[in-house]
Amino acid sequence: MNGFETVDNIEAYNNLAEAIVTLACEDYRSYRKQLRKATSRLEMEQLAREKHDVELNIRLLNSKILEIEKFLSSPYGMMLSHQLGDVILEKLRNE
């Protein structure tokens, strides 16, 4: 067993995965809603900056997903990947 294989770490990775999905969905929905409401050029410029921030957030979240995938590709993680994958897929379906 290595440090990644404790119950607390598995639970933490599961919580992180759920938070990543939730945050990415909320950021994107918020951006799209504001974009529809934008009426002036200044609002559009501000939204373009916010879109850039959202894109940066998504890149950061993607790097966290890669960390999770690395863990899940470990021998111990592979045993858990189906269970965690099901949780993540269910969360995505519900969003």
Which residues make up each language-model segment?
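Hydrophobic residues in alpha-helical segments
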Residues: 32-35, 39, 71-72, 92
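Helix-centric, low-specificity signal for extended rod-like, repetitive segments
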Residues: 22-25, 44, 57
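Generic alpha-helical secondary structure signal
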Residues: 17, 32-35, 56, 75, ...
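Short, compact, well-ordered microdomains
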Residues: 69-95
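Acidic, low-complexity, intrinsically disordered interaction modules
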Residues: 48, 53-76
